[in-house]
Every structure is written in structure tokens, then in C-alpha cells.
């Protein structure tokens, strides 16, 4: 769907928008079917002069490629809704359905179709501007904590969606593990940050849910640096968890 002029001015760069549309028209007329188109997005934080551009230097540029051609994603580098355009028929064929009246479903939107994606194209242009830092924003920590049940629901849906060990392509499997890991880390740290006994119980229940669903996945997530840091025991351990998350935000740009 084409965006209105006002939406384009607020969220996306017109020059990049035109380049992408031209390239999509060109690729649509080609011999090879394209499943996913990727472009850069920009974090623009309210009140800050520095803008963080999410580039994908690990991806081949300006030609169609497959997962086999992808280099390793670094920590903090994810394909988000702001950077991806899926082929519409692929979304229908993979059975994508998003929970209604729920925040944070953009993670399901990006995650669910990935195993169906065989061909990709990356254009190194800064397309979408993602404005962050507003107090009423859904990714604001206080807002996320108030909606934590919706975040947990999305997290569980992603856990249930696939047996990741059966994803045949090793590079895709590794990326999907990393994506599920950061979603689980975010759920966990928000539950810790709330400071309530009720939410600490929800934290334990979330990890038990993962363990009950897939014991190998549970151990894989727990064995990672962030997984370990999120599950340190006691009040002191929780302080270390929050400090580790804050450090990760600064070092690798978690939002």
C-alpha cells in the first residue's frame, strides 16, 4: 500500500521511497521471484542530535541472494518491521495471523515468514525513520511494563511458532535464535525492572514455559551471555541484570 504524503514526510525519506519503488517494479518484472526486500532504518531519539542508522553490511547489495550468502548478524542487528518489505502472497501462504488488539505484534510479523523466505534483496538506503524517546510510546519502558502481558503473549507465540532445530538453513536458524533471544531478554528485563513480586513470578513462569515447550531451546537461551545475565538469583542478581541490559543498550544499541 502506498503511504500518504504526510506519512511519508513523518516516517520515511521520499528519495529512498522512490528508489525502492523503482527497484521493486524492476524486480517484479524479472525472472526470479523476490520474497523479502530490506533497507536501512534510522533511530531518531527525541532531544538527541545523534542518529543511529541500522545498516546491514553483512548482506550482499544490489542483487537477489539467498540465506547461504548472508554473513553473520552482529549482536543488536535485527531485521525489524521498519526495514522489511515482504511479498504479499508469501505472507498469505505462510499463514501469518497477528493477535488482535495487541501491541508488539510487529515481532511476529517479521519472525513468522522467515522460513518461507528463499530470496532476498538489500538496498543500502536510509528508508524509515523510527522516532523514539516519547513518554507515551509503546516501546517506552514504563509503557512496556504496563503492557507486559501483551509482550509475554507475543514472546510465547514466537516460542510456539517453530521448532528452530528443524530449520534446515544453518544461517537462518542462527539468526532466528538470536531474534527470539532478544525478545525473551526484553520480556525478562521489563519484568525485573517493574520491581513487583507479581512480575517476578511472571518472569519465572515465562522461563518455565520455554523449558516445558522446548528444553533444548531453554538451555540454548540460558547459555547465552544475556540469558545468563537475566537469570541471576536474588536482589543483587537482578541489579546486575539491569546493569547488563543498560550496558548492552549503550554498546550494541538495544532499544
Predicted features and spans:
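Inter-domain helical "communication" segments and dimerization helices
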Residues: 26-33, 48-61, 70-73, 92, ...
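Donor-binding/catalytic cores of nucleotide-activated saccharide
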Residues: 13-121, 128, 132-144
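Inter-helical turn/loop segments and adjacent helix faces that build the functional surface
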Residues: 98, 165-171
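Single conserved hydrophobic/aromatic residue that forms the stacking wall/gate
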Residues: 1-14
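Membrane-interface aromatic/basic loop that binds lipid-linked glycans or pyrophosphate carriers
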Residues: 193-255
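Amphipathic alpha-helical protein-interaction segments enriched in hydrophobic
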Residues: 170-189
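Catalytic core of nucleotide-sugar-dependent glycosyltransferases
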Residues: 125-134, 140-167, 186, 190-216
